[in-house]
């Protein structure tokens, strides 16, 4: 018996690398040394940094992959993978430099997986980071044929004196919420249960734009790199940032606040997309689970002083983002109060 008979096609793996080369090369940056195919990727740090600090992040796409593979939405989950990583590291004010991907599959399907990598490359291009390397592992018997899992790794850099860590946030500062692109990549274990329980037709229209349900659910995660870089280039003094992922606003917004401060949120201050109301109704999801599972239309938060709100909102609008003042930072009104208050119970 040979390796191919055992389920691993080495020649197909080499052909797959050739298939994705163009997409990968399109993500290059001037700091890159050499090309793809070596044992490691090489990259210089950008010029002009006095005390560069590296910021690393890793993430996956979760069970959204199950739904995406059922409906052949391979390109979109590639973007999701990049977004879940870069959106985390930019909360420190860092600039993404490079991305690495890991794909594990039961049987190499070059057409499907090349679409995944094209999506990853697209996410990297929009984030101005190079897809410097990756690994595709064919694992017969471990994953079923036609199924794959993804993991991503991002490295970013920030000038040490410009690190944004929330330490300057004080009571009275304002919280700006930036629109999400739908569910992003969180809550899909619940979504899949709701779909199974409701028996909903995946092609039903769920909003005023007449978007089919499956398209609304599988919208790629928004990339906030350009937005944050634009705000920083306009010298908006951002005090803190939060990427709203699993756990929603209650779990993620307090992560950028100093100890001893709370966030007060006004739920009616932004438009919650209709897909979230559909899920809540179809799945009989309790109010607190709804808020603690989904982003509900807010994918990223900025904390700025009151006198910077107007300028920050103007920049968001100029580059095509809907954004709202959704709350404020305050001191706890009673001992032991939750870090985020104001949400419906």
From Swiss-Prot:
Specify the pathway: Purine metabolism; IMP biosynthesis via de novo pathway; 5-amino-1-(5-phospho-D-ribosyl)imidazole from N(2)-formyl-N(1)-(5-phospho-D-ribosyl)glycinamide: step 2/2
Q: What class of enzyme is it?
A: ligase
Q: Known CDD domains for this protein?
A: PurM
Q: Keyword Plastid, does the record have it?
A: no
Q: What is its main location?
A: cytoplasm
Biological process terms in GO annotation? 'de novo' IMP biosynthetic process; adenine biosynthetic process
Is ATP-binding tagged as a keyword?
Answer: yes
Q: Superkingdom, according to UniProt?
A: Bacteria
Q: Which residues fall in a coiled-coil region? A: none
> Where does this polypeptide localize?
Cytoplasm
Reaction(s) catalyzed by this protein?
2-formamido-N(1)-(5-O-phospho-beta-D-ribosyl)acetamidine + ATP = 5-amino-1-(5-phospho-beta-D-ribosyl)imidazole + ADP + phosphate + H(+)
Tell me any Pfam family this protein matches: AIRS
Question: What does the UniProt keyword field contain?
Answer: ATP-binding, Cytoplasm, Ligase, Nucleotide-binding, Purine biosynthesis
Question: What InterPro entries does this protein's entry cite?
Answer: PurM-like_C_dom, PurM-like_C_sf, PurM-like_N, PurM-like_N_sf, PurM_cligase
Family classification = Belongs to the AIR synthase family.
- Name the PANTHER family for this protein: TRIFUNCTIONAL PURINE BIOSYNTHETIC PROTEIN ADENOSINE-3 (PTHR10520:SF12), TRIFUNCTIONAL PURINE BIOSYNTHETIC PROTEIN ADENOSINE-3-RELATED (PTHR10520)
Q: What is this protein called?
A: Phosphoribosylformylglycinamidine cyclo-ligase
What organism does the record attribute this protein to?
A: Prochlorococcus marinus (strain MIT 9211)
């Amino acid at each position: 018996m040979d390796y191919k008979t055992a389920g691993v096609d080495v020649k197909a793996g080499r052909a797959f690398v050739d298939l994705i080369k163009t997409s990968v090369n399109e993500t290059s940056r001037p700091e890159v040394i050499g090309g793809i195919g070596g044992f490691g990727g090489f990259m210089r740090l950008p010029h002009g940094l006095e005390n560069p600090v590296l910021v690393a992040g890793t993430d996956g796409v979760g069970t959204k992959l199950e739904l995406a593979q059922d409906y052949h939405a391979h390109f979109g989950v590639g973007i999701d993978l990049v977004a879940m990583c870069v959106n985390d590291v930019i909360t420190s004010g860092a600039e993404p430099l490079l991305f690495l991907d890991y794909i594990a599959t039961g049987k190499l399907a070059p057409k499907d997986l090349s679409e995944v990598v094209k999506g990853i490359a697209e996410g990297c291009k929009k984030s101005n980071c190079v897809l410097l390397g990756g690994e595709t592992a064919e694992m017969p018997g471990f994953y079923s044929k036609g199924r794959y899992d993804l993991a991503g790794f991002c490295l970013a850099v920030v000038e040490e004196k410009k690190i944004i860590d929330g330490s300057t946030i004080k009571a009275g500062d304002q919280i700006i919420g930036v629109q999400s692109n739908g569910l992003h990549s969180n809550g899909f274990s619940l979504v899949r249960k709701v779909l199974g329980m409701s028996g909903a037709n995946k092609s039903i229209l769920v909003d005023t734009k007449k978007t089919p349900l499956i398209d609304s659910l599988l919208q790629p995660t928004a990339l906030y790199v350009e937005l944050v870089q634009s705000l920083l280039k306009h010298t908006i003094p951002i005090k803190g940032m939060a990427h709203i992922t699993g756990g929603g606003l209650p779990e993620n917004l307090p992560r950028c606040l100093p100890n001893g401060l709370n966030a007060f949120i006004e739920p009616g201050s932004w438009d919650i997309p209709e897909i979230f109301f559909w899920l809540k109704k179809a799945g009989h999801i309790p109010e607190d689970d709804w808020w603690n599972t989904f982003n509900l239309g807010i994918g990223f938060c900025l904390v700025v002083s009151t006198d910077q709100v107007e300028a920050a909102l103007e920049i968001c609008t100029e580059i095509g983002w809907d954004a709202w003042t959704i709350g404020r930072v305050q001191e706890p009104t009673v001992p032991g109060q939750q870090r985020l208050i104001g949400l419906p119970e």
